[in-house]
Amino acid sequence: MREPGFWHRPPSLVSRLLLPIAAIYGNIAAARMQKAGTTVGVPVLCVGNYHMGGAGKTPTTLALVALLREFGETPVVLSRGYGGRLQGPVQVDPSRHSAADIGDEPLMMARRLAVVVARDRTDGAALACALGATVILMDDGFQNPALTKDASLIVVDSHRSIGNGSVFPAGPLRAPLPLQVARTDALVVVGDGAAADGLAQQITTKGGVVLRARLVPEPASVEALRGRRVLAFAGIGDPARFVATLRGSGVEVVEQRAFADHHPFTAEELAELAAAAKRDGLTLVTTEKDLARIGRAQQALGVEIVPFAVTLAFGDEAKLRLFLLDRLNGARAAKLAGRR
């Protein structure tokens, strides 16, 4: 869905008119969040958002995977598979699954590690354990109570933060903020903006950890676009951030097209993009997530679509390492004590 503009502006008449519905939605979401979950035999780390839309969960998940592997862990990502038709539980296989089957983010991540898609997260966790997981990384699912989480890391964009701070549909929040803050163990603030500073202070005050991070373009992606004029397009939570990252890397963005998050590109839309690129002598560039969703349809266009890959770099990686090790050790000690 495309986010309404009023979600990211000071409270307006529209948002105020929607507050009664937001109160009902918030009460239901809060009651659901507080339900008891199933305890899994391995640590469960959740990477989530307070709000609808994207803020960098997937790059954060992949960065955590890299660190966990350095610790000698075998992480398996568990995803709901948003946008896919399969109920699961199923291990994602990039050679036979498409984004229409299991969602764009799971497909993209499955090229790098084991990913399980399941609508029922308890069943998904069982499959992840059967695959040899020593740690389960939930990609999204912070508000879902199905599994007991040993640590919840919430990702927020430093420029957009949580918008107007209201619960859906008056604003972008998935549940009342105080409840979500209370259940947060670490806040990952992506970027160098100040919009999330107040939120970070709330997390610090309650004893949580605040981690600063930034999206760093992969050198190969920057090199592939050197000297080219590009038409950038993206169907992600914040397409403007994608364009800003391109320009910040020295890429000459001549044209840009924004689509809703998880947008299913039609053949007509792709053909129009290809025609515009050919007409103006531009190179099409998009995100890895969008390219996963486009899939084999790219082959019929007659033009190249260059994926622009980014990774998440933490400002204080030692702080993150200590946090992860503490949570992993604490989770294992608690699970061991529970078996006695």
From Swiss-Prot:
The lineage of its organism: Bacteria, Pseudomonadati, Pseudomonadota, Alphaproteobacteria, Hyphomicrobiales. Its EC number is 2.7.1.130. It comes from Rhodopseudomonas palustris (strain TIE-1). Transfers the gamma-phosphate of ATP to the 4'-position of a tetraacyldisaccharide 1-phosphate intermediate (termed DS-1-P) to form tetraacyldisaccharide 1,4'-bis-phosphate (lipid IVA). It catalyses: a lipid A disaccharide + ATP = a lipid IVA + ADP + H(+). GO terms for molecular function: ATP binding; tetraacyldisaccharide 4'-kinase activity. NCBIfam families: lpxK (TIGR00682). It comes from the Bacteria. Belongs to the LpxK family. The gene is lpxK. This is Tetraacyldisaccharide 4'-kinase.
